[in-house]
UniProtKB/Swiss-Prot annotation:
Family label: Belongs to the alphaherpesvirinae glycoprotein G family.
Function: Chemokine-binding protein that inhibits neutrophils' chemotaxis.
SUPFAM superfamilies referenced in this protein's UniProt entry, alphabetically: Immunoglobulin
Glycosylation sites: 104, 163, 437, 512
Intravirion domain ranges by topology: 672-699
Signal sequence annotation: 1-22
Protein name stated in the entry: Envelope glycoprotein G
Skewed-composition ranges (Polar residues): 348-359
Virion surface side: 23-650
Species: Human herpesvirus 2 (strain HG52)
Feature: compositional bias, Pro residues: 448-459, 467-482, 544-554, 589-605
Length: 699
């Protein structure tokens, strides 16, 4: 009685520990045992179709044989067997093996499966059985013991061993081929198993024995709750300490070479029933939404599991190959936009009064038809253009077509420089995006003035003007007028004449040419009107436009024949004060000039001005004096040949040597003192005795 009580107490304690069937570590069957799981085609209930943890089988007892075993003398080769299904799910591939040892005898078994691809023969599962009953297939219940299950993929692996068969999840059209090696006593059974989903039947690569299977694979329902929360992952997938190979890489074996436990990178310590549940859980996580709890979906169409957020094992994107060879493989949003050809690059200096311009390396080709002036023979000759005195700023206006989208976009003010632009001044008046319409209404109401008798010489070297010869269809020649509207002939696409670049008057600001854009009604023709040139009423007179003031931005050519439609028809602009602008109003001589709105300063640093200045030269950046090297650093001369690091190492070596020398001297002195004291004690330990003969005493 006293011996039984401790055993009962120990059994009671062990029954409550985590990891046992009756404890709280791993729960029992949560769902009914396969009562709600059926094949989509109406086949019988599958005992392996579940996705929750079960502990129905006894656990493994130890590791498999570490050494690589040789092939037995007798090898039985089976014909390849293939199965094709219409839907996805879990499929049990059973090898065609019938003889399992002699009756009334025991045998040992070794089951190994390989996954075959075009370039690799990868071992995926390995298990050994011992003490199996003859006449029955090896399993955890018919054998006395079995080893851990070694896995070649994962974690966790998507395949599972069911006795001597292979449980495979299928969900895509790609066919999979497996090789099995089952050793039963002294016989080795070898063969191939093939499976696919989708299609009308076995494909061209299927074995001859492949046929359409009845029904279809089973689909496990999603378990309620979180049954795998209490199952440690080390049970069903842990690193194999005896693995000989590279981690996270397939282990490929030569043909007909048996695998050893050292060829598989992972090992599972859980029983077979738990590993089957892991395979079902992996399938529903990869191929089905997790919110469909307890719902058995209908027949899945072929290829329904290929896409979507739950598509299993998507192909690895080949970023390097796409970026190197295939331009279409690169995302167009990531690709940098190609810098187009601009008319000119403009920038503004915040410290100076006059804006500066940077030349563009690639000039814009302007067709001759676009630059040809529009002339109507029936139109009355208008007054010739006039010029301003040499000390005043000479400007030119060209009629261009501006779309409503372009007028709605605001752009920073800039001035087109004739000296820096490689095109003529007339070519600089092409339309562009991002510029407003600056037509003047007051110029259309003012009568023309008397032309000047002389024409000042041009000052531009890049845009040298050519004199215009008066003809029967042209207006009298004249230099560039400083008006905001068409002083020169407006270009049209149907005119055979060519445009002559205007001349610029000499002066302190003769290099700066302000370009104004006006809007004309397409389909009409007329003559260009000349704005007034009186100093008091001229919009760019000395009282209103001082030298160096910013001018309207130059238009930018965008290309396309539709932008030049109706341009240069010579129609007077509408009388609209909103389109006149502040710079084109007649100033009052008795009042100070109106305050001009401050120019919009660029917010980007020089050299990063966006599409307007792709080739803007940067100012030379000078490094601070403290960052500039003063001269070559003298090479360190070590105190000893073995000290080559730094002068600090020399000092540290000297200090350390001094300390150690002093310590050594102290130790030697202490040892000498102790030795001297011990020698003195030894000398006085045995004192010499002398006997002296005393004389006798006298009475």
């Amino acid at each position: 009685m006293h011996a039984i009580a401790p055993r009962l107490l120990l059994l009671f304690v062990l029954s409550g520990l985590p990891g046992t069937r009756g404890g709280s570590g791993v729960p029992g069957p949560i769902n009914p045992p396969n009562s709600d799981v059926v094949f989509p085609g109406g086949s019988p209930v599958a005992q392996y179709c579940y996705a929750y943890p079960r502990l129905d089988d006894p656990g493994p007892l130890g590791s498999a044989d570490a050494g690589r075993q040789d092939l037995p003398r007798r090898v039985v080769r089976h014909e390849p067997l293939g199965r094709s299904f219409l839907t996805g799910g879990l499929v049990l591939l059973a090898p065609p093996v019938r003889g399992f040892g002699a009756p009334n005898a025991t045998y040992a078994a070794r089951v190994t499966y390989y996954r075959l691809t075009r370039a690799c023969r990868q071992p995926i599962l390995l298990r050994q059985y011992g003490g199996c009953r003859g006449g029955e297939p090896p399993s955890p219940k018919t054998c006395g013991s079995y080893t851990y299950t070694y896995q070649g993929g994962g974690p966790p692996t998507r395949y599972a061993l069911v006795n001597a068969s292979l449980l495979v999840p299928i969900w895509d059209r790609a066919a999979e081929t497996f090789e099995y090696q089952i050793e039963l006593g002294g016989e080795l059974h070898v063969g191939l198993l093939w499976v696919e989903v989708g299609g009308e039947g076995p494909g061209p690569t299927a074995p001859p024995q492949a046929a359409r299977a009845e029904g279809g694979p089973c689909v496990p329902p999603v378990p309620a709750g979180r049954p795998w929360r209490s199952v440690p992952p080390v049970w069903y997938s842990a690193p194999n300490p005896g693995f000989r190979g590279l981690r996270f890489r397939e282990r490929c074996l030569p043909p007909q070479t048996p695998a050893a436990p050292s060829d598989l990178p992972r090992v599972a310590f859980a029983p077979q029933s738990l590993l089957v549940g892991i395979t079902g859980r992996t399938f529903i996580r990869m191929a089905r939404p997790t919110e469909d709890v307890g719902v058995l979906p209908p027949h899945w169409a072929p290829g329904a599991l290929d896409d979507g957020p739950y598509a299993p094992f998507p192909p690895r994107p080949r970023f390097r190959r796409a970026l190197r060879t295939d331009p279409e493989g690169v995302d167009p949003d990531v690709r940098a936009p190609r810098t187009g050809r601009r008319l000119m690059a403009l920038t503004e200096d915040t410290s100076s009064d006059s804006p500066t311009s940077a030349p563009e390396k690639t000039p814009l080709p302007v067709s001759a038809t676009a630059m040809a002036p529009s002339v109507d023979p029936s139109a009355e000759p208008t007054a010739p253009a006039t010029t301003t005195p040499p000390d005043e700023m000479a400007t030119q206006a060209a009629t261009v077509a501006v779309t409503p989208e372009e007028t709605a976009v605001a752009s920073p003010p800039a001035t087109a420089s004739v000296e820096s632009s490689p095109l003529p001044a007339a070519a600089a008046a092409t339309p562009g995006a991002g510029h407003t319409n600056t037509s003047s209404a007051s110029a259309a109401k003012t009568p023309p003035t008397t032309p000047a008798p002389t024409t000042p010489p041009p000052t531009s070297t890049h845009a040298t003007p050519r004199p215009t010869t008066p003809g029967p269809q042209t207006t009298p020649p004249g230099p560039a007028t400083p008006g905001p509207v068409g002083a020169s002939a407006a270009p049209t696409a149907d005119s055979p004449l060519t445009a002559s670049p205007p001349a610029t008057a000499p002066g302190p600001s003769a290099a700066n040419v302000s370009v104004a854009a006006t809007t004309a009604t397409p389909g009409t023709r007329g003559t260009a009107r000349t704005p007034p040139t009186d100093p008091k009423t001229h919009p760019h007179g000395p009282a209103d436009a001082p030298p160096g003031s910013p001018a309207p931005p130059p238009p930018e050519h965008r290309g396309g024949p539709e932008e030049f439609e109706g341009a240069g028809d010579g129609e007077p602009p509408e009388d609209d004060d909103s389109a006149t602008g502040l710079a084109f109003r007649t100033p009052n001589p008795n009042k100070p000039p109106p305050a001009r709105p401050g120019p919009i300063r660029p917010t980007l640093p020089p050299g990063i001005l966006g599409p307007l200045a792709p080739n803007t030269p940067r100012p030379p950046a000078q490094a601070p004096a403290k960052d500039m090297p003063s001269g070559p650093t003298p090479q360190h001369i070590p105190l000893f040949w073995f000290l080559t690091a730094s002068p600090a190492l020399d000092i540290l070596f000297i200090i350390s040597t001094t300390i150690h020398t002093a310590a050594f001297v102290c130790l030697v002195a202490l040892a000498a003192q102790l030795w001297r004291g011990r020698a003195g004690r030894r000398r006085y330990a045995h004192p010499s005795v002398r006997y002296v003969c005393l004389p006798p005493e006298r009475d």
